[in-house]
């Protein structure tokens, strides 16, 4: 072996793990890396599985950060929440890039194993549903999808009835003294949020006097960041689906691309977008 080809091993590097935990054990890699089970013999099904599993792991972290941010804002601890929400945006940017990898799957390749999926579909992702709930887009009718698993159904039911990120953001406006209409404060939070003139007026005042309401302004911009990234994710999802299956019906029974295009019109924080026109 030539001198420049020698493997450099520092003396302090640990090599005896008979009584110590290894990297693989800490991350439970045996379990994690044995979860990619193809239902067909097609080579590209592994890509399909890994992309979706990796996205679910990132969504788990998004939920971890969102729920912590919601609790932090409830307790008037906005600065820690800003860090958590900024991290959510970074994770979102990472997930968006995964569509570029999935887009390497051609229609001819996908059709070889698509039937193996049966009725399984990303539409059924319970973590994505919980992210929507955490952001304020509540869809009670969607709970029926998860009745097969009572424990999971109960978790989603709890998430449906929990205050969303936008709920606690509006409460932060109230604590600052903004007059928010009682219908907003007493609304059924299990239903999709509908924009309100008093909420818009409050955010407009925040944006008109940034120095006075700096923390609320920062909070608003963090929310905009998250919705912006989410819409980019939705768009890349729609275009990747169109690229691979065209306008076929989705495996979950949806209209596919047509449904995904309609979803692009859904907004989580409507007043924060409206104030940009009003300023």
Swiss-Prot record:
Substrate binds at residues 48-52, 110, 114, 251. Heme binds at residue 237. Pathway: Amino-acid degradation; L-tryptophan degradation via kynurenine pathway; L-kynurenine from L-tryptophan: step 1/2. GO terms for biological process: L-tryptophan catabolic process to acetyl-CoA; L-tryptophan catabolic process to kynurenine. Binds 1 heme group per subunit. InterPro entries: Trp/Indoleamine_2_3_dOase-like, Trp_2-3-dOase_bac, Trp_2_3_dOase. It catalyses: L-tryptophan + O2 = N-formyl-L-kynurenine. Belongs to the tryptophan 2,3-dioxygenase family. Homotetramer. This is Tryptophan 2,3-dioxygenase. It comes from Bacillus anthracis. The lineage of its organism: Bacteria, Bacillati, Bacillota, Bacilli, Bacillales.
């Amino acid at each position: 072996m030539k001198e420049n080809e020698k493997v450099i091993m520092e003396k302090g590097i640990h090599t005896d793990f008979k009584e110590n935990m290894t990297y693989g054990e800490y991350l439970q890699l045996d379990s994690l890396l044995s979860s990619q089970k193809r239902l067909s013999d097609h080579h590209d099904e592994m890509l399909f599985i890994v992309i979706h599993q990796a996205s679910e792991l990132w969504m788990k972290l998004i939920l971890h950060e969102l729920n912590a941010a919601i609790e932090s804002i409830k307790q008037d601890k906005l600065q820690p929440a800003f860090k958590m929400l900024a991290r959510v945006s970074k994770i979102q940017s990472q997930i968006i890039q995964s569509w570029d990898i999935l887009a390497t799957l051609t229609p001819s390749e996908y059709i070889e194993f698509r039937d193996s999926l049966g009725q399984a579909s990303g539409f059924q992702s319970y973590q994505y549903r919980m992210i929507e709930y955490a952001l304020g887009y509540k869809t009670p009718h969607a709970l029926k999808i998860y009745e097969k698993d009572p424990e999971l159904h109960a978790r989603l039911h709890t998430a449906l009835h929990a205050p969303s990120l936008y709920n606690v953001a509006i409460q932060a406006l109230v604590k600052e003294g903004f007059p928010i209409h009682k219908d907003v404060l007493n609304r059924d939070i299990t239903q999709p949020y509908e924009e309100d003139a008093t909420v818009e007026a409050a955010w407009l005042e925040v944006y008109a006097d940034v120095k006075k309401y700096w923390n609320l302004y920062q909070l608003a911009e963090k929310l905009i960041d998250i919705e912006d990234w989410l819409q980019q994710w939705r768009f890349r999802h729609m275009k990747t689906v169109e690229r691979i299956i065209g306008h076929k019906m989705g495996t979950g029974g949806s209209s596919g691309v047509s449904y995904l295009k309609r979803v692009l019109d859904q907004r989580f924080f409507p007043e924060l977008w409206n104030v940009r026109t009003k300023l």
